Amino acid sequence: SWGIVADVNQGPAAIRDTAALIEADADIAALIAKDIKIGSQNLERLVSTADGIQMTGDTLSANHHASNVLFNIMRGGLFIDNYAIDKSDLTSFCAQWNQRVFEANTTFFDALPETLLYHDLDAALLDNTDLQLERLCREYLPLSFSRRHGDPSRPWNRFAIKVKDEKGKKLLNYEGNWRDIFQNWEALSSSVPCFGANMISKFVNATTADGYNPYRITRQGIDWERPEPENPWANIGYWGDHQLIYLLKLIEQSVAHNPAALESMMFRDAYAYANVPYRIKSYASILSDPYDTIEFDESLDRVIDKRVEEMGADGRLMPDPNGGVYQVNLAEKILVTLLSKIANFIPDTGIWMNTQRPEWNDANNALVGTGVSVVTLCYLHRFLNKVVPLFSALSQETVQLSEEEAEFLGEVRSVLASHQSSIGAGPVSDTIRKDVMEALGTAAERYRNRIYEQGCSAVKQTVKLANVIDCLARARDVSAVSIRSNRRSDGLYHAYNRIAVNTDGVQIKYLYEMLEGQVAVLSSELLEADESLSLLKTLRNSPLYTARQHSYLLYPNRQLPSFMARNLVPRTFVESSRLMTALLSSGNTDLVEQDQSGQVYFAGKFNNTASVAAALTRLASEGYAEDVAAER
């Protein structure tokens, strides 16, 4: 027998030792078999640690569960020693993030045993008064086995599983895209629930003051994409649906396992804001070009790099006026996440996708800009449905919020209250839809501009929790109305819509059915039991079900036009256009071209609407200004 073995990542000495072993009289086959057995046992132990080994009457389901858990921990990692914490690794983590805070708290670390449990660290923090230190320790997660995604379209993301350092010592590390990490931590938190509080800390400390998250997250900090004009894969922007459902699932787990811990987190200023150098444009600019909505602040990016050199990974967090890390409570972090979505709410339509990135749930990946998500609206409703009673049950009657955030909350509450009678009752007119969209959008713009231009003032304002709850309850109620407005005539629900904005209002353009819309509505906790059953039956009898696979499709298997059937400009349209008629008469092919049979097409050089807009601008300067102005 023979085998092919790849013993990779070996240095020159190790290579020669391996060669000597092969040339020796040792039973190589037996050594390899023994190593495979040890590796298999180690892998089984890892899967077991995350509750992946089950024994049930359904062997196929048990095996399926084991493979799911394996793939899960390969992305998000696992707590290889459960709740055990190595003090040396904890101190290394804290020093890497903020050397000054670490040095100021050497007494705290000296008092800790060399090996401790999560609960020991939690108890030690109760006697601590340094909230910066508490933030660092609350964010510590001793994870291992996490790998990068390995998607070739993301050059940074080379496949790797690192479990040992160069000296062969166990390596605690994790890294990945935001979705890869938090989607898998949701499941992991069921196995080690107390660390769920630290996962929440990691999540909210990596979100920005304007309510979004960077692209990449690692043990060493956060990272974001930068403009690369020469790289067709590169782009900046925020994915639209990360902020809600992943955080909500972690909060739900925390409430289920340790509600007292979550309440204590609500009022402690032990959380920070990521300082991503993206600047979302004004509402008017977004409305003018919803595909180009974010600017990259190169000077701020350089300042952040310098801060990282000086203080550690904390340099990527929003500073306070004194240059330290600005900290707020968990209640504020949750509110920022929710308000950023509510501010992009369009009645009867969904949540506007206007940050240059699609949603992961978007099966088309092409709706960003004019696309509006019912999917995210459903998850927003579920979040609001949970957070209203959560805030109502808090023991305090007031909460301290950043002055800027408190004013933003007040403006959003005012908009919802003034339009409650219309958007809270059912479908509204295009005019009212635009009025609400503009009022919310400009409120968010004022808040963002204040943060962008001045940073956080660090001035806190006392806000009645009753006012916070009132705002969130109003948002919950209108979200429920809009979700129901998206019920299709066939009993399914819209997943995504498009909008057309004009001077008179906002029109909704509905799309075909998609699976994600049904999943989101079922997850929203809006439907009654009989409504959910009806939807499931309708789904089974819809074009989304495929009997061949006994499963469901993301969207129906539609008959699409062939290549030769595309880009055909109808004769009636050409004849109604003075501009096209004039261009064809003069032989100008900047906008349209014609074949020998008389069929008209848009110029083949166009790859998007921006190309068409540029051509129209050129034509306006070449003697066609009147016609361009009339038809543009």
Predicted ranges, named:
Residues 1-632:
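Acidic, mature catalytic/reactive cores of soluble proteins
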